[in-house]
Amino acid sequence: MVINGIAYKALVRFSVIDSTDLVKTATKKHNLSPITSVALGRLLTGIALMVPWLSKNDTLTYIIEGSNKIKYIAAQSKNNGNVRGYILPKIVDTITNEKGKFDLKSAIGNGTLKVVRDLGLKTPYVTPIKLISGEIAEDLTYYFTISEQIPSAIALGVLVDKNGIKRAGGIIIQILDQSLPKKDITEIEKKFKEITPITNFLEKHTPIDALKHIFGKKIEKTETHEINFRCSCSHQKALESLKLLKVDELKEIIIKNEIVEVSCKWCSTTYKIKPEEVKKILEEKNK
């Protein structure tokens, strides 16, 4: 569940989430290694924080393209709270930094962050920026500050232990108007640092506690939004994908008389297509 709202006479907006269940679901569906769980988990958490600020027909996608072991991460959210994502490759050997923590910067390497906003019009808006960190939260912060010119503070975290995902969560704070006094900004920055790492804070506190710690009585309004890892794939869409094959390829499948498996990249669900279904597709192509 995401909690969002406004503070400081609507000069500041915020969104916070305990995304543990979301990240656990993604990790299980894709059968990820620890460091890929952390990478995808952070991006999923970051995109989930944006759900309250999406319009009805909006689809928001974050894409990270890396140059090292982690090549590609994608996360997508819609206004209805449905979030999905995937990472390539799914299994990567753990890389740690001098503090013994997951080193996403090294695992991802140099690369780009693309923010894709599909407003339901003909062409989505795509904004690419270079990764400045690879730790994801810092890269999203840089994007909002530079590309959207909204001063932002973002914390994202995924805590892993021997049993898997222990805790995941995130928070974003955005200053919507430059008339907010400097002393208030300084106070927000100070309080924000006190609740990070966000996963450590959420181990003993709730997302509401994080908001109260930062804003106190300055909070003016809060709302809640359900968040679920839910894909829009279906058996019918799997059939549609086979229609892209050439006639000769479809004939070859029919000759083998085997069930065809089509996997969704977003959620790793596998759909089994029967030979007679492939025959129907071929018949339609030959009409």
Swiss-Prot record:
InterPro entries: Heat_shock_Hsp33 (IPR000397), Heat_shock_Hsp33_C (IPR016154), Heat_shock_Hsp33_N (IPR016153). Pfam families: HSP33. Keywords: Chaperone, Cytoplasm, Disulfide bond, Redox-active center, Zinc. It is found in: Cytoplasm. GO terms for molecular function: protein folding chaperone; unfolded protein binding. Gene3D superfamilies: Hsp33 domain (3.55.30.10), HSP33 redox switch-like (3.90.1280.10). GO terms for cellular component: cytoplasm. GO terms for biological process: protein refolding. Disulfide bonds join C231-C233, C264-C267. Its main location: cytoplasm. Under oxidizing conditions two disulfide bonds are formed involving the reactive cysteines. Under reducing conditions zinc is bound to the reactive cysteines and the protein is inactive. Belongs to the HSP33 family. Redox regulated molecular chaperone. Protects both thermally unfolding and oxidatively damaged proteins from irreversible aggregation. Plays an important role in the bacterial defense system toward oxidative stress. PANTHER family: 33 KDA CHAPERONIN. This is 33 kDa chaperonin. It comes from Thermosipho melanesiensis (strain DSM 12029 / CIP 104789 / BI429). The gene is hslO.
